Amino acid sequence: MKMSREEYAELFGPTTGDKIRLGDTDLWIEVEKDFTVYGEEMIFGGGKTIRDGMGQNGRITGKDGALDLVITNVVLLDYTGIVKADVGVKDGRIVGVGKSGNPDIMDGVDPHMVIGAGTEVISGEGKILTAGGVDTHIHFICPQQMEVALSSGVTTLLGGGTGPATGSKATTCTSGAWYMARMLEAAEEFPINVGFLGKGNASDKAPLIEQVEAGAIGLKLHEDWGTTPSAIKTCMEVVDEADIQVAIHTDTINEAGFLENTLDAIGDRVIHTYHIEGAGGGHAPDIMKLASYANILPSSTTPTIPYTVNTMDEHLDMMMVCHHLDAKVPEDVAFSHSRIRAATIAAEDILHDIGAISMTSSDSQAMGRVGEVIIRTWQVADKMKKQRGALAGENGNDNVRAKRYIAKYTINPAITHGLSHEVGSVEKGKLADLVLWDPVFFGVKPELVLKGGMIARAQMGDPNASIPTPEPVFMRQMYASYGKANRSTSITFMSQASIERGVAESLGLEKRISPVKNIRKLSKLDMKLNSALPKIEIDPKTYQVFADGEELSCQPVDYVPLGQRYFLF
């Protein structure tokens, strides 16, 4: 039997060579490989193939290895590739990406992907599946951020804070062992993975070690607490010993030293630099130079991406609020103006496009929007395609660019903070934190958000309706968000030192606990598809940015895709 590509796609989803548009962007991904078998596709429903004795094996039990969940015929968009496959989940983890079914009557079935009577099905035909996002720049200012982030497709939040305290509104630090314990306890209620950064600003190691042993997955150096060369050196010594990450927000006003002094204090040790663009903070005007160094893992935040006609005006007011500045104090106003530079903000988009900035993150409620990491990452990708054209290696599709940009908020932040053994990609063995998208709504409104293999958020209609689809349809909490299910489907990340000291047990934590690890030997070359090391120079008078001698400049846009048209209802 033969059928047209159009007919096949309508029934079973796109196959090798077919293209899918991402939302209302100008980005098109092309299926590189199809792991399903033509004629033996797994389809659920009346008269379909997932029935007893057909695609469903009638003998295999859960103990024998039957899948708990299969997502059928879905297109995976991951840094590893853009492929069509079935995705198998067992005990909350991904056990296979390939062909599912009943090996008794079918060829090519992955032995780890056998469908049995205990297997649930999510139909992925015509849908896109991605890994849950990892946001590494969270100010834990209000718990409602968790709901917004999860509803956007972000499933892991890393950062610091204790609520709307003045320090937390400005810096991503959960300061001290007592607050670390309380935040670990609070995290029990949320169906999302979390990890907390302690305050890294101290000239002695003891208060830093205390926070690491209390559970901190890393330390945060922030200029508002004094990011001096002494504090940097002390912090770096502690994280090297504990195999955790340090995130740094450098000295905007160059009070305790210049960029070169910070580099000397860091040495050749790996560090995650926040706000590489500078608008969010850091050595003015040349913090962006750090993206040239192999031991620097650079990220930027949602406020400045993509560069639009409104970016400059919006930032000045935000700056005054977020950093507790006074518009009546001339020095505070000058501080704000020193950070908002059009030339470096414009260069930020291009550095993302060439893979020199490795990660995107939110800076939640502290200049950034926690629910817009994914939206804004894809808006930059769209803007760069329109302004810079296709990337090398692309032939009639945007696969190279798509894989580069999805890596910025999935695998690369997971690697940077030592979580990639658990999350960050759609790969065998990882927690099944997965996001299912209708291509029309890609990047904006997920259809389903799975945590540890269970649906935590979904687009759902009127609960009193006779079917799930009647209006109003919007993102609602699902069963993985309730009771003890949120504890068994999510992870609290902690330092190895705190785990060995029994902190989780002493606090009575019930969530899965996992250590961060394999951090201190990282380099930028470990950043997937975002490891470029151009020589970056910045004119101190005009703030023009040059990479390998080429000026990086682009125009602000007055329209972005994935924008207001999606939020009319």
UniProtKB/Swiss-Prot annotation:
The keyword Transmembrane does not apply. PROSITE patterns: UREASE_1 (PS01120), UREASE_2 (PS00145), UREASE_3 (PS51368). Coiled coil: none annotated. GO terms for biological process: urea catabolic process. Signal peptide: none annotated. Its cofactor is Ni cation. Residues 132-569 form the Urease domain. GO terms for molecular function: nickel cation binding; urease activity. One of its GO terms (cellular component) is cytoplasm. Keywords: Cytoplasm, Hydrolase, Metal-binding, Nickel. It catalyses: urea + 2 H2O + H(+) = hydrogencarbonate + 2 NH4(+). It is found in: Cytoplasm. Its main location: cytoplasm. Gene3D superfamilies: Metal-dependent hydrolases, Urease, subunit C, domain 1. The keyword Kinase does not apply. Ni(2+) 2 binds at residues 220, 249, 275. Pathway: Nitrogen metabolism; urea degradation; CO(2) and NH(3) from urea (urease route): step 1/1. Substrate binds at residue 222. Its EC number is 3.5.1.5. Ni(2+) 1 binds at residues 137, 139, 220, 363. HAMAP family: Urease_alpha. Heterotrimer of UreA (gamma), UreB (beta) and UreC (alpha) subunits. Three heterotrimers associate to form the active enzyme. Belongs to the metallo-dependent hydrolases superfamily. Urease alpha subunit family. This is Urease subunit alpha. The lineage of its organism: Bacteria, Bacillati, Bacillota, Bacilli, Bacillales.
